Swiss-Prot record:
Parts forming coiled coils: none
Domain PPIase FKBP-type: 162-247
GO biological process terms on file: 'de novo' cotranslational protein folding; cell division; chaperone-mediated protein folding; protein transport; protein unfolding
Protein name: Trigger factor
Lineage: Bacteria, Pseudomonadati, Pseudomonadota, Alphaproteobacteria, Rickettsiales
Keywords: Cell cycle, Cell division, Chaperone, Cytoplasm, Isomerase, Rotamase
Amino acid sequence: MGITILKNEGLDFHARISTPLSEIDDDIQKELLDLTKKVKIAGFRAGKVPVSIVKKKYGTSVRNDIIERRINNSVNHVIKEHNLNIIGRPKIEELQNESDKALEFTVKIELLPKITIPDLKKISLDRPKLEVNSKDVEEQLEKLAALTKNYTKESKAKIKDGDQVTIDAIGYIKEKAFEDGKLNDFKVIIGSNALIPGFEKQLIGSKTGSKVDVNVTFPENYHAKDLAGKDARFVVQIKAVHTAEPTVIDDEFAKKFQSNSLEELRTHFTKQIENESEEAINTIMKMNLFDKLEKLLDFDVPESLLEQEKNILKSGTDKNEQDESLLKDKSSKEITAYYNKLALRRVRIGLLLAEYAKSKNLQLEPDDLRKVIMQQARNFPGQENMIFDFYKNNPRAIEGLKGPALEDKAVQYIFNHEIKLKEKKYTKEELEKYLEAEEQRITLI
């Protein structure tokens, strides 16, 4: 076998490989002889089929198999001989395998960069810490009480905030009734904002039996595109008004929600508030860590990974209206530059974390994958069981989660064992403002 190195610089390794025809022919002859002992052909006893007959029937497929095997073995030899740390499948080009010439081909191999892990102990980050107070918990209790109000008392008084109103309504645009603009026996809590902005407010002050004209404008982002941004008039018939019975928040109230006492329900809400904030805090901290890492990394990355990441980014932005709006006023050149920079950041950090996980011998446990699946499920409220079933029945989908799961594990290990974390306490209101500001900053990161 002859090997001529054509290129060995950066992350590209190209070589021209040739194998004498005699070696190929020898392999073909051995394979055909083996087949004479195995194949069954009408008119010949088992093991007694002439080579010429076997060659006529199987010669082409045997030759193709031998050539493919030779190519794979040659490429593997080159990789091992030159100690190449490859990514992806080697590309075979300029293949010459005519019967009167040697087997020749060019192999192009993309390499992973050599990664030096920076001194992570020099990195310091603030770690937000939520301090849940009694006011936060009482707000949750009041929300729960509001959701479980019992609207049994019919009212003849004027409609006010908090009342439950039963209505019939017909919607008109330019005095023409529009499709899906009719409501029958529809119940709405005034002030819940369940209807188009401004609709509920215009019912306040009316009474049972009244007919009310409600004028509204559909939001620009309304789900029915043919109605978005349009003015509409609804003729509303007030059929019934009910007020809520006062809800007493006590031990009996708590028992309706699988708690033995009100104190136990308060403890449950305290933990719930902490857990809900923890995921958002971890996401922000992860991005802040990546900001620090980005400044420390300057190694080249494989072009194939870069292109793959750019395509993922573009596809994700096309499906996300908020992300798309951030780029709508940018020129084509600016958008390309943005994607290039962001893709480079992501690929570099991804490669670093993979190398770090390898250096620390971090292994995925079943619980690590469960956490990632739980995170995925939380993105689809009300459809959690569907998400769990999807991953349960799709092993290949589980494979796709292993990369992100290992990355998360590496990040948590860095938080726990490497960088300096300075705890910074926040009230719930302060934390919400901080997280909102941070989320806007890292929307596309």
